[in-house]
Amino acid sequence: MRAAALALLFPLMAHAIDVQGHRGARGLLPENTLPAFARALELGVTTLELDTGVTRDRVVVVHHDRRLNPDTARGPDGRWIDAPGPAIHSLSFEELQRYDVGRLRPGSAYAKRFPHQQPLDGVRIPALKDLFSLAEKDKAIRFNIETKISPEAPHETLPPG
Protein backbone atom coordinates (compact mmCIF):
# COMPACT_ATOMS: atom_id res chain seq x y z
CA MET A 1 0.00 0.00 0.00
CA ARG A 2 2.73 2.42 0.98
CA ALA A 3 4.74 1.70 -2.19
CA ALA A 4 1.64 2.24 -4.31
CA ALA A 5 0.99 5.61 -2.65
CA LEU A 6 4.59 6.68 -3.25
CA ALA A 7 4.38 5.56 -6.88
CA LEU A 8 1.30 7.75 -7.35
CA LEU A 9 2.91 10.75 -5.64
CA PHE A 10 6.26 10.58 -7.45
CA PRO A 11 5.08 12.28 -10.68
CA LEU A 12 3.62 15.11 -8.60
CA MET A 13 6.84 15.48 -6.61
CA ALA A 14 8.95 15.55 -9.77
CA HIS A 15 7.11 18.67 -10.93
CA ALA A 16 7.71 20.32 -7.55
CA ILE A 17 11.49 19.95 -7.71
CA ASP A 18 13.35 22.92 -9.17
CA VAL A 19 16.52 21.71 -10.88
CA GLN A 20 18.78 24.73 -11.38
CA GLY A 21 21.66 25.01 -13.79
CA HIS A 22 24.04 27.03 -11.58
CA ARG A 23 25.90 29.42 -13.90
CA GLY A 24 24.72 27.11 -16.66
CA ALA A 25 26.45 23.75 -16.45
CA ARG A 26 29.72 25.10 -15.07
CA GLY A 27 31.07 21.74 -14.03
CA LEU A 28 30.99 20.74 -17.70
CA LEU A 29 31.52 23.95 -19.69
CA PRO A 30 32.78 27.51 -18.99
CA GLU A 31 30.44 29.15 -16.49
CA ASN A 32 27.92 31.83 -17.39
CA THR A 33 28.46 31.28 -21.12
CA LEU A 34 25.95 30.44 -23.83
CA PRO A 35 27.44 26.95 -24.34
CA ALA A 36 27.07 26.23 -20.59
CA PHE A 37 23.45 27.39 -20.57
CA ALA A 38 22.68 25.40 -23.74
CA ARG A 39 24.09 22.28 -22.06
CA ALA A 40 22.02 22.93 -18.93
CA LEU A 41 18.89 23.15 -21.09
CA GLU A 42 19.85 19.90 -22.86
CA LEU A 43 20.20 18.24 -19.45
CA GLY A 44 16.64 19.28 -18.56
CA VAL A 45 17.09 21.92 -15.87
CA THR A 46 13.96 23.85 -14.92
CA THR A 47 15.75 27.07 -13.91
CA LEU A 48 18.85 28.81 -15.20
CA GLU A 49 20.76 30.49 -12.37
CA LEU A 50 22.99 33.36 -13.38
CA ASP A 51 24.57 36.61 -12.32
CA THR A 52 24.53 39.90 -14.18
CA GLY A 53 26.57 43.04 -14.48
CA VAL A 54 26.21 46.17 -16.57
CA THR A 55 28.83 47.50 -18.95
CA ARG A 56 29.82 51.15 -19.30
CA ASP A 57 27.44 51.49 -22.26
CA ARG A 58 24.59 49.94 -20.25
CA VAL A 59 24.51 46.45 -21.75
CA VAL A 60 23.37 43.87 -19.20
CA VAL A 61 25.79 40.95 -19.36
CA VAL A 62 25.95 37.51 -17.75
CA HIS A 63 28.96 37.35 -15.43
CA HIS A 64 29.42 36.23 -11.83
CA ASP A 65 31.90 38.77 -10.53
CA ARG A 66 31.96 42.56 -10.60
CA ARG A 67 35.38 42.27 -12.24
CA LEU A 68 36.83 39.94 -14.82
CA ASN A 69 38.24 36.91 -13.04
CA PRO A 70 41.97 36.25 -13.66
CA ASP A 71 41.29 32.50 -13.38
CA THR A 72 38.76 32.53 -16.24
CA ALA A 73 39.65 35.47 -18.51
CA ARG A 74 42.34 35.90 -21.13
CA GLY A 75 43.00 39.16 -22.92
CA PRO A 76 43.09 39.77 -26.68
CA ASP A 77 46.72 38.59 -26.69
CA GLY A 78 45.64 35.19 -25.29
CA ARG A 79 47.41 35.75 -21.96
CA TRP A 80 45.71 35.38 -18.62
CA ILE A 81 44.76 38.75 -17.18
CA ASP A 82 46.34 40.03 -13.98
CA ALA A 83 44.44 40.51 -10.72
CA PRO A 84 42.46 42.50 -10.11
CA GLY A 85 40.72 42.23 -13.44
CA PRO A 86 38.95 45.26 -14.90
CA ALA A 87 35.53 46.09 -13.50
CA ILE A 88 32.70 45.09 -15.84
CA HIS A 89 31.18 48.58 -15.59
CA SER A 90 34.45 50.17 -16.74
CA LEU A 91 34.32 48.38 -20.11
CA SER A 92 32.02 48.88 -23.06
CA PHE A 93 30.33 45.74 -24.37
CA GLU A 94 32.63 45.84 -27.39
CA GLU A 95 35.69 46.02 -25.13
CA LEU A 96 34.37 43.17 -22.98
CA GLN A 97 34.03 40.99 -26.08
CA ARG A 98 37.81 41.09 -26.53
CA TYR A 99 38.24 38.80 -23.52
CA ASP A 100 38.08 35.02 -23.88
CA VAL A 101 36.38 33.23 -20.96
CA GLY A 102 36.40 29.75 -22.46
CA ARG A 103 38.86 27.97 -20.19
CA LEU A 104 40.20 27.84 -16.64
CA ARG A 105 43.70 29.00 -15.75
CA PRO A 106 45.80 25.84 -15.32
CA GLY A 107 46.73 25.17 -11.69
CA SER A 108 44.18 27.64 -10.29
CA ALA A 109 41.78 26.79 -7.48
CA TYR A 110 38.98 27.07 -10.05
CA ALA A 111 40.66 24.51 -12.32
CA LYS A 112 41.09 22.14 -9.38
CA ARG A 113 37.44 22.55 -8.41
CA PHE A 114 36.19 21.77 -11.93
CA PRO A 115 38.66 19.27 -13.39
CA HIS A 116 36.14 17.97 -15.94
CA GLN A 117 35.16 21.34 -17.38
CA GLN A 118 35.68 21.23 -21.15
CA PRO A 119 37.66 24.24 -22.44
CA LEU A 120 36.14 26.15 -25.36
CA ASP A 121 38.46 28.76 -26.81
CA GLY A 122 36.81 31.85 -28.24
CA VAL A 123 33.89 31.96 -25.81
CA ARG A 124 32.80 35.45 -24.76
CA ILE A 125 30.71 36.92 -21.96
CA PRO A 126 27.16 37.05 -23.32
CA ALA A 127 24.62 39.82 -23.20
CA LEU A 128 21.57 38.85 -21.14
CA LYS A 129 19.35 39.33 -24.20
CA ASP A 130 21.36 36.65 -26.01
CA LEU A 131 20.72 34.19 -23.19
CA PHE A 132 17.00 34.98 -23.37
CA SER A 133 17.10 34.30 -27.12
CA LEU A 134 18.82 30.97 -26.50
CA ALA A 135 16.29 29.93 -23.86
CA GLU A 136 13.11 31.14 -25.57
CA LYS A 137 12.55 27.73 -27.19
CA ASP A 138 11.78 26.32 -23.73
CA LYS A 139 8.65 28.15 -22.65
CA ALA A 140 8.72 26.53 -19.19
CA ILE A 141 12.27 27.59 -18.30
CA ARG A 142 12.64 29.90 -15.33
CA PHE A 143 15.45 32.22 -14.36
CA ASN A 144 17.16 32.92 -11.04
CA ILE A 145 19.05 36.15 -11.71
CA GLU A 146 21.36 37.85 -9.23
CA THR A 147 22.45 41.39 -9.97
CA LYS A 148 25.99 42.45 -9.18
CA ILE A 149 25.10 46.09 -8.63
CA SER A 150 26.10 47.04 -5.11
CA PRO A 151 25.94 50.32 -3.18
CA GLU A 152 28.71 48.81 -1.02
CA ALA A 153 31.10 48.77 -3.99
CA PRO A 154 30.29 51.95 -5.94
CA HIS A 155 33.74 51.93 -7.56
CA GLU A 156 33.07 48.45 -9.02
CA THR A 157 29.46 48.76 -10.21
CA LEU A 158 27.04 51.18 -11.72
CA PRO A 159 24.95 52.99 -9.12
CA PRO A 160 21.60 51.34 -8.28
CA GLY A 161 18.62 52.86 -9.98
Where are the regions that the model predicts?
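Sec-dependent N-terminal signal peptides
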Residues: 3-13
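Phosphate-group recognition and catalysis centered on beta-loop-alpha active-site segments
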Residues: 12-161
